[in-house]
Amino acid sequence: MTRFARYACALLLLLVATPSIAHAADPSGDGLGGHLRTTDDRLRRLLDLGTRTSPTLRALVRRLIDSDVVVYLWCERADTAPADGRLTFVSAAGGHRYVVVRLVRFHSRERQIALMAHELRHAVEIADAPDVVDAESLEREYRRIGYMSSTPTADRKTFDTRAAVDAGVQVMNELMLADDD
C-alpha cells in the first residue's frame, strides 16, 4: 500500500469515526448543514463571519450544502505546508464525496477567509463534476478546467482554476468593503 493510500485510509477512518466532534457550518440555519466541517474553533468563527459578510462565500457554502460533497477544513502550520491552501480528495462512499481542505493559518482574518473561499470554490468545482470520484478523476477534471500551478513532483501535482482565483479575490474585496462600513 502506498504512503498516500495509507494516509487516505487513516484519514477516512478518522473522519467516519469522529462525526460527533465535527461542526457543520450552516449559514442559512435551516438544518441543511453537515457538508462543511471543522474541529478548529477559529476556522469555524471565520467561516461564520465570512458567510455573514460575503455574498460570494455564502453562495459557495449554499452550493456545497446542496451537493454530495463533504468538506473537512483543517489549519496547518506554514512551515510544514507545501502551499497556502490545498484540497485533497479522500473518498467517495455512502453517496457522498469527501475532501479535505488544508489552510495555512494567517493572522489576517480577511486573508484567511479569502483563502478559504478560494479552496471552497475548488470543492464546488468537484460538486459540479459528478465523475470526480477519486484522485485520478480529480486530476483529469483539473486538467480539463484548470492549469498546473507549480512544477509537478513525483508525488504531487498542483492545479488551480481561474474561477477559484476570482472567488478568493471577490471575497477579499467584499470583506474589505464591509470593513469600510
Predicted regions mapped to residue ranges:
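N-terminal targeting signals for Sec/Tat export/insertion, comprising classic cleavable signal peptides
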Residues: 33-70
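Bacterial N-terminal signal peptides that target proteins for export
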Residues: 1-9
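Acidic/histidine-rich, surface-exposed loop or edge segments in extracytoplasmic proteins
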Residues: 30-44, 95-104, 143-152
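Metalloprotease/metallohydrolase-associated module, dominated by Zn2+-dependent proteases
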Residues: 59-63, 67-70, 74-89, 93, ...
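Catalytic Zn2+-binding segment of zinc metalloproteases
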Residues: 120-136
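Boundary at the C-terminal end of the N-terminal hydrophobic targeting segment
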Residues: 22-24
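Short pre-active-site segment immediately N-terminal to the catalytic Zn-binding motif
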Residues: 100-116
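Bacterial N-terminal signal peptides
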Residues: 8-19
